[in-house]
Amino acid sequence: DLVVIETAIKTGMRRGELANLLVSHIAFEANRIIVMNGKGAKDRTIPMGDNLKSQLLELCAGKKANEKVFGFKAVSLGMKIKEWGDKAGVPIKAHSLRHYFATNLMERGANIKQVQELLGHESLATTQIYLSLMADHLEDAIQLLE
């Protein structure tokens, strides 16, 4: 189940995008996740690293192409992430993982335009809001889920 957390922090996908992710939206051979009908009904492509790819390959094994990867609706996914955080003693929400993704990328040297594109933001100003959070406390929170 925690593959969904890993996917969120490694892709910056929105809660609804994670919930609606189909097996056919993952291009394993190209190391890409295709977000279909994201916010504003826009599609985007997000690269994925080898670690996430291997976790998703394992999770998707035996599933049909039109099957959801995680099997949650958006609202229940948000509640599940909160529940996992509560279990670990960390107040966390699905959207916090998106903030973590953006902040972590910037701290590791990505430029703001790259982060904007990965998050699927139309406006650079929206991306700048995401970067106002400090990653340290979010990273500590994620480690508690390990």
PLM segments and residue spans:
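Short, leucine-enriched amphipathic alpha-helices that occur as contiguous helical runs
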Residues: D1-L2, A74, G78, R98-H99
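DNA/chromatin major-groove-contacting recognition/catalytic segments
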Residues: P47-D50, L133-E146
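Basic, Lys/Arg- and aromatic-enriched nucleic-acid-binding interface segment
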Residues: D1-R15
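Active-site/catalytic core of tyrosine-dependent DNA strand-transfer enzymes
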Residues: G49-P91
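C-terminal catalytic core of tyrosine-transesterase DNA break-rejoin enzymes
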Residues: E6, K10, E83, R98-E122, ...
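Catalytic tyrosine of NAD(P)H-dependent dehydrogenase/reductases that use a Tyr as the general acid/base
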Residues: A94-H95
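Conserved tyrosine-mediated DNA breakage-rejoining catalytic core shared by Y-recombinases
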Residues: T11, N20-Q55
